[in-house]
């Protein structure tokens, strides 16, 4: 005895893995024959052959099709099969003698399944009650002509169901469309007046599970003439060639899954006809026809309905495109404006944020977020910045490729409940790693009318340890208030977002190429300048030395003949030459910093400071400077360049002491992943407004009469420290001395 048990998610997942295409059961009104080629030997046949042909399966198995039907009927079929013209066979009119002089005429349809087996399906040929053979197609064309006269989709849908019902004579015809959650929605209906309406009702995804949907794509027309007919097995159940059940995916007569038959019975349906509406390889919807009693559908009428369905859906697509055209034009205008603004702005982020109405209008959103580099900019109605940061981390973990969108974010990201009023819907496009554009939509409360309680679409019973699913028995109106959902994202909105992504990526690539070309040009120019500076420095040294030597020789040889003014002039010349030599030496040093890679070695900084102090010994003694050096670490650095930095900073501390006796402190501290060194003096100090200027080559804050120098010392220091992947900065105020800091990364 079967007992009712609690329905679990695992039980429902059975619906997603059903192998209904290999069930070896067929509908009882026709015959299925599996044939072995080339002789068309019968290897399997449905067990109802006894009632239809008057011959048992045992009698027919192993015989050829030509022995069942006259050979003059089968020979042309074999010829076409040999020629690869199987589609031209369908349908083939075949007749067979059943008893005495009685004959049965069949519509024969042939196909090869996934295993390459030839399957022949035979249905008794029926004539329509009120139409000749070719009348079906004339009727379909008349229906299409009426459809072409409709101005909008709503009327178009209504005419579809009216015409299909007129063509088929079914009690009820519904146009059934799947939404973004795969639930079904009855968007049009034509029925007998005494029947309860289903128009506007929703049906849960489990009513038509994925295996069934895949079969609807393979079988654009599906007929069940008698819901109460007892399914018939194939004999034998396993094909002798493949040793497994026959794949009946393409079969017309394949029996429906027992759950679906129970579902139809619970709805009071005796016969059904289903026409698939397929768009871009996906099941867009169905034209579902129901009759309260069994109903035979002639083969010709089915083909006319299939033809009608294909043409109708091409018209639905065209109508949908027409009705969304104005909206697409509006979105395209937003996109064009944004592209223009991004191109002319300093960067694309500025181009987007300066025109929030365009950015939001592009996808019909109320809020947006731009995450690019270190920037996170919120536009319109959005979650707070911290919530958006967490959401971005979640998106990165999902490894979104092109686009991510949902109208119910909280179902997959529970924290979204906290900001449902602004972001129940999310559309996200990754621009590059760690960079996203997000659009948000608020929660919109909706009332959905279901055909029965969607939370109890199935019941489960258990018998002998086996769980069976049974569809619900009630299809009464069941209202649900849907929360935590936004309006769904339309396809044109998603395409607009992707178009913007493409524009941004192209813009970034173009700017990157321009920057790369600029960098190449700068590198070439810098190389030329460095080469010029290096050569010029060497070439200028010799004539300057000659000038200095000859001027000093002139003073020595003719000193007695020179008056005081002449001696002063000679001193000025010697001093000028000396200054020029110092400047050339500094230029040469600056050029070497760029042209020679730092020779990193494990360096004792204490020894480096001692060498710098030794080089400055004379200046220290002359100025009476007090030098205090703290404990120093060892680092990876270029010893000579590091000595130049300390020597320049100490020399500046002595030079810019003003009227005071110089006091200089030197120390080093470990800070996170770097050593930070400091040189502190008690000199004249520097106004903070000049902090950047002093590191620029040839920039001076004082005249040469006040303080001697070339204005290159700090520029050289900056170049050296940056070559070590470090930074240099200072703290100072006028009259309060200066402290220069520079960092060298640990493990440099």
Swiss-Prot record:
It catalyses: ATP + protein L-histidine = ADP + protein N-phospho-L-histidine. Signal peptide: none annotated. GO terms for biological process: detection of visible light; protein autophosphorylation; red, far-red light phototransduction; regulation of DNA-templated transcription; response to red or far red light. CDD domains: HATPase_FilI-like, HisKA, PAS. Keywords: ATP-binding, Chromophore, Kinase, Nucleotide-binding, Phosphoprotein, Photoreceptor protein, Receptor, Sensory transduction, Transferase. Pfam families: GAF (PF01590), HATPase_c (PF02518), HisKA (PF00512), PAS_2 (PF08446), PHY (PF00360). Homodimer. This is Phytochrome-like protein Cph1. The lineage of its organism: Bacteria, Bacillati, Cyanobacteriota, Cyanophyceae, Synechococcales. The gene is cph1.
